[in-house]
Every structure is written in structure tokens, then in C-alpha cells.
Amino acid sequence: MQTQEILRILRLPELSDLGQFFRSLSATTLVSVGALAAVLAYWLTHRPKALQPPCNLLKQSEEVEDGGGARRSVIGGCTQLLTHYYDDARTMYQVFRRGLSISGNGPCLGFRKPEQPYQWLSYQEVAKRAEFLGSGLLQHDCKVGTEQFVGVFAQNRPEWIIAELACYTYSMVVVPLYDTLGPGSISYIINTADICTVIVDKPHKATLLLEHVERKETPGLKLVILMEPFEDALRERGKKCGVDIKSMQAIEDCGRENHHAPVPPRPDDLSIVCFTSGTTGNPKGAMLTHGNVVADFSGFLKVTEKVIFPRQDDVLISFLPLAHMFERVIQSVVYCHGGRVGFFQGDIRLLSDDMKALRPTIFPVVPRLLNRMYDKIFHQADTSLKRWLLEFAAKRKQAEVRSGIIRNNSIWDELFFNKIQASLGGHVRMIVTGAAPASPTVLGFLRAALGCQVYEGYGQTECTAGCTFTTPGDWTSGHVGAPLPCNHIKLVDAEELNYWTCKGEGEICVKGPNVFKGYLKDEDRTKEALDSDGWLHTGDIGKWLPEGTLKIIDRKKHIFKLAQGEYVAPEKIENIYIRSEPVAQIYVHGDSLKAFLVGIVVPDPEVMPSWAQKKGIEGTYQELCMKKELKKAILDDMVMLGKESGLHSFEQVKAIYIHCDMFSVQNGLLTPTLKAKRPELREYFKKQIEELYLVSV
């Protein structure tokens, strides 16, 4: 065929030909074609787009060459561990100054009174108040430099951040204190850290500190600064024992009149000493540098940079304790980008009201709260039809999530999930959970229902909060993600638990610029945690999955041996039993002189009555807790879950006690991160545990 003939055949029709074609169509056909074209155009422009992962999800980490089995993140393609993300933000002082510059003196710290809208302090106001407070501290015998430790004993509020920034402005070190440490622990920390100044929020905390001084337990404490108003009687009481009681406003006024030029810290300078709670013996003070904190949140930024990068219009709700590094690292990310942090009113029961008023975009949360959300959602689906529809809608959304689509505007959102999203303010685009294992079932459902990206991290205070993090696009559950770009992770044999690295299992060890410098004045426990090569031994047992992600499978800490010689990790068992529908909280107890386990169960007051009714058991919550048939039904449900999860018979509890009141931070049975305080639980339920063993024998 000739070239000219081919071109003639392939040529586009002339406009006159097209016009003639369309004129030959009926009006009905033309309308139909137009409607079809409009629908197609709308679909093309509005179709949901899958999130593009930053790496191959089948290979999220790789072995380090000559690293003894250590693995690293593949994100970023650099073999060097990440120490910082921005050259102008290498200390916590610089992080805040960067936010001040980016925001253009925008809103920074928010607070609200009951039934009132949020009020905001600007970045410039916060920075100025921090300089005045820091200068005032210097006028009251504090010294510039990392030898000066300042205690902060307060609930989350703007003044906490101002006090922290005041310390950083003059290279001083922050030491958070919190109620659940207990009176004995607080005096131990004040003495160990040589703290002469403590900043508190409420008068009763100042009174507690004065009692220690009056008993001559903390002779070095000389100044207590109060954020809230107080009576003259408190000031007079302080004078009698040699402690100056002053308002935070008075210290700021003093600093305004006697201003000192900032003396910023260096990356290697100590920034904060976080004392752990919930363990036996005295608290351990983890020493973290500015570089530690910056490296940790830089790892988070690197992982998420192409998918959900922080913005100036981001708003974070702050309710997790600021004494915990998980909350502090997430807040640092927000400040670094000129975002806003709004504080809850101080009552967790009003958190939903605060979120509706604040409308946050970032929501850091612990798994226990996610579990409560999940239980409440399904409890409200109070008929079999409602539950079926809810599960059906969730499955449709979960199918989208598996294909990488995260959205909140589907038909299923309109019908079912928008009310749930509205309860969180309606603007949440990122949820980060950590501090404890999250249930795969709960995480999978909420990723669908909340229509936002839900990330899970793993770590501990000693590695500045996180060492692994969900890779964007990997919305599978049952693991804690891949190593952050700021650290390597390796597994080592745990012989006593029969975990071996040759099987890809072992104790999790972390090394990198986010790993702490040791415990304050505690060489013995520092050597237990950090080996001679700088590896942090976490005490957790992990397993590498084929995709290069890490799965937490056990815990070396808190393990004990039963009388027959079998090792038991109670937290692993508790994480299985907590999935029982009527169970809100559980404590599994074992003894080396006993051959079996027993448990303390707190039923969920919102779920348990209806669950019991289905079993034919009637009564109020208090009445149900006393009924033997209900106790048996709950135990049977727990044991069934244990069997389904592969627990050995010796890992199953043989008897339980039903307790009506929740374990809480206030009653001393939970840490501020809502983890069980096992020694306290053991002592609190000593009588009930003894009775369980007697009856079971």
C-alpha cells in the first residue's frame, strides 16, 4: 500500500464530517451522549487516587553491610543515619525559632475554659515569655548551662511549653515530674538531679513539695514557682522551711526588668531527663540530648515527606502527658513547621468536646483510647442489622484502604462514618499511635472508619520515643513498621525465652543518634541497657517479617517462671484477652510457686450489660460484677480467644476476679502512658489473688 493511501485512511475526520455526524443523531441520543461524557469527565477528575508509597512495600528495610544482622530503612537511599532534617533546626531551641519564622508570628499555643472557644498565644508571645521566664530564673540563682536542672510538675498546658522553652533558651535541662511517680519517687528525683527550682501548676503540688522539705527529704529545693494563683499562707509556709514561693508571672516580670541575652544549646547538649515510672526500685532518669530529639522526629519527617508532610495550618490536640517523649516528639514536629498545639481542659472525659472545638488535624493517641472508640462505635450498633451494616460498610472501606486509597468522602462515609469523624472535630488527617501494642482488628477498622492516615510506631523513652514507624501506604496490621532512617535495629538471641536470631526472632536492639546517653547517676542500669557497642537493649522480643517490617511478639521484661518451669510473658497474654468484648482492662498474675495463672478483669461498663443480656444474665453493672455466671461467661470467652491465638494451656488463666472500678492514673494502677503498673497491681489485689489460688486449688 502506498504511503499516501495509508495517511488518507488514518487521517482524522474533518470538522464538517463530525458536524454532519452529530446532526444525524436524535436529540435523545445527543442528551445521552452528553450525560455520559459528563459522568466520565466527573469520574476522571474526582476518582479516588491511591497513595504512592515512598518505597517498595515488599522491601521496607535492608540488612546493613557488616552490621551483624542489623537492618535499616530503605527510605531516602542514604547509608548514613539521619541526624537532622533541617540545617536550621538542630536543637529544640532552633526548632521553635524556625516555627516562629515560618508562622509569621501566627498562633502557637491554645487553651480553653469550659464551654468557651480556644484562645491562642502567638509564637512571638511564647518566645518572649520564655526569655523573660528564663531571665527571671537566672536572677533567682539558676545558672546558664546543662548543669542546671529545672523541674516541671504540671499537667499539659501552655505554661509547660513556655517553661520548657525558657530552659532551652539558656541551655538548661528540663526534668518533668508527674503525680503518678509517687511522693517517694519525687523526692528521689529532686535529689538525684540536684533540682533547686520546680515550676508547678497548682498549689497542692507546691504543698506536696514543701512537705518533703519540712521532713528534710529534699534540702536542695529552694524555689517553687506556681502557674496558678495561691494563698499567702503557702508563701509563709515556704519561708519557714527556707523555700521561696513565687508566681510564674512574678518571675517573668523580674526577667523582663533584668533581661539576659539567650545562650542557645548545641545539638550534643543535654535537653531533658525523663524519669520512668511503672518499674520496681527507684525511677531511672533517661538523659536525652537536643540531637536525640531532633534525630527522632527527623526520622518521622523523612518517612512521611512525600505523603503527609506537616503544614503551618496543622493543629494538634495535646492530652497525652508531656512528661512522655511520644507526645513531646509529635509536638516538636508541629512547632518546627509553624503549626498550632491546643491543650485539652485537663479532664479526659471532656476530650471529645475539646476536639470538636479545636478541630485538630493531628491526633496522637494510645491504643487504649482507640480500643474505647472501637467498643463505643460497635456498642451503639445495638441491633444485629445495624452491626451487619456497619461491618459491611467497614469492609468496603477496608478494601479501598488495602488498595492505597484513604478518603472520607465515599458513600460509606456519608452513610455511616461521617458522624464518627465529626466526633474528632472532622478535620483529622493523621493519627499516630504508640506506647503499647495496637489491636490489628481495631486499627484496621479505624483506618477505614476515620478516613485518615493512621500510623503506628514502636519505641521507648531510651530511644527518644520511636525507632520504627509505619511506612505510608502499608496499611496492613500486626506489625510496627520498618526502622526509622535515624536508627538501625538488630535482634539478638533471647535464650531464656527460646528466641533465636537464626529464625529471625530475638530481643530488639537499637542504635543511632536517637538513642539516649544513659541513666542519670546510675552506671549499673546504664550498662544493663547500653552495651559496649552502643546498642540499646529494649527488653522486647521482635520478629522480622518478609517485607522488612518488625513484629513485636513477646516481652523479655516482666517475664516470670511458673512452678513447673515454664516461662510466661503476661503482657502478651493480656493483649490477647483484651480483645474479649466485655473486657475493658485485665491484669494477668503468675507466681514461681504456683503452677497456673490468675487474672483481675475490669468489665467495660458500656458494653458488658448488653453482652450479659445476650447470655441471659440480667442486672445493673454493679450487680453483674458480683454474679458467678457472668464471671464464668467472661472467663470462657477469654479462654476461647486464647485458644484461637495459640496460647499454651499454661498461658491460660484458670480463675479471674471481677473488679468494678477501672485501673487509672489517678488510683496509681496505670502509668501516665496508660500501661499497667504491675508491682502496684500485684500489691493492690494481693488479697483477691490469694483467694483465687486458694479456691482454684
Curated annotation (Swiss-Prot):
<dbReference type="GO" id="GO:0005789">
    <property type="term" value="C:endoplasmic reticulum membrane"/>
</dbReference>
<keyword id="KW-0496">Mitochondrion</keyword>
<keyword id="KW-0436">Ligase</keyword>
<dbReference type="InterPro" id="IPR042099">
    <property type="entry name" value="ANL_N_sf"/>
</dbReference>
<keyword id="KW-0472">Membrane</keyword>
<dbReference type="GO" id="GO:0047676">
    <property type="term" value="F:arachidonate-CoA ligase activity"/>
</dbReference>
<dbReference type="GO" id="GO:0004467">
    <property type="term" value="F:long-chain fatty acid-CoA ligase activity"/>
</dbReference>
<keyword id="KW-0460">Magnesium</keyword>
<dbReference type="GO" id="GO:0005783">
    <property type="term" value="C:endoplasmic reticulum"/>
</dbReference>
<dbReference type="GO" id="GO:0005524">
    <property type="term" value="F:ATP binding"/>
</dbReference>
<dbReference type="InterPro" id="IPR000873">
    <property type="entry name" value="AMP-dep_synth/lig_dom"/>
</dbReference>
<keyword id="KW-0256">Endoplasmic reticulum</keyword>
<keyword id="KW-0276">Fatty acid metabolism</keyword>
<dbReference type="GO" id="GO:0042803">
    <property type="term" value="F:protein homodimerization activity"/>
</dbReference>
<comment type="similarity">
    <text>Belongs to the ATP-dependent AMP-binding enzyme family.</text>
</comment>
<keyword id="KW-0443">Lipid metabolism</keyword>
<keyword id="KW-0735">Signal-anchor</keyword>
<dbReference type="GO" id="GO:0005741">
    <property type="term" value="C:mitochondrial outer membrane"/>
</dbReference>
<dbReference type="GO" id="GO:0005739">
    <property type="term" value="C:mitochondrion"/>
</dbReference>
<keyword id="KW-0576">Peroxisome</keyword>
<feature type="transmembrane region" description="Helical; Signal-anchor for type III membrane protein">
    <location>
        <begin position="25"/>
        <end position="45"/>
    </location>
</feature>
<keyword id="KW-0492">Microsome</keyword>
<dbReference type="GO" id="GO:0007405">
    <property type="term" value="P:neuroblast proliferation"/>
</dbReference>
<keyword id="KW-1000">Mitochondrion outer membrane</keyword>
<keyword id="KW-0547">Nucleotide-binding</keyword>
<protein>
    <recommendedName>
        <fullName>Long-chain-fatty-acid--CoA ligase 6</fullName>
        <ecNumber>6.2.1.3</ecNumber>
        <ecNumber>6.2.1.15</ecNumber>
    </recommendedName>
</protein>
<dbReference type="GO" id="GO:0005778">
    <property type="term" value="C:peroxisomal membrane"/>
</dbReference>
<keyword id="KW-1133">Transmembrane helix</keyword>
<keyword id="KW-0812">Transmembrane</keyword>
<dbReference type="InterPro" id="IPR045311">
    <property type="entry name" value="LC-FACS_euk"/>
</dbReference>
<keyword id="KW-0067">ATP-binding</keyword>
<feature type="topological domain" description="Cytoplasmic">
    <location>
        <begin position="46"/>
        <end position="697"/>
    </location>
</feature>
<dbReference type="InterPro" id="IPR020845">
    <property type="entry name" value="AMP-binding_CS"/>
</dbReference>
<dbReference type="Pfam" id="PF00501">
    <property type="entry name" value="AMP-binding"/>
</dbReference>
<comment type="function">
    <text>Catalyzes the conversion of long-chain fatty acids to their active form acyl-CoA for both synthesis of cellular lipids, and degradation via beta-oxidation. Plays an important role in fatty acid metabolism in brain and the acyl-CoAs produced may be utilized exclusively for the synthesis of the brain lipid.</text>
</comment>
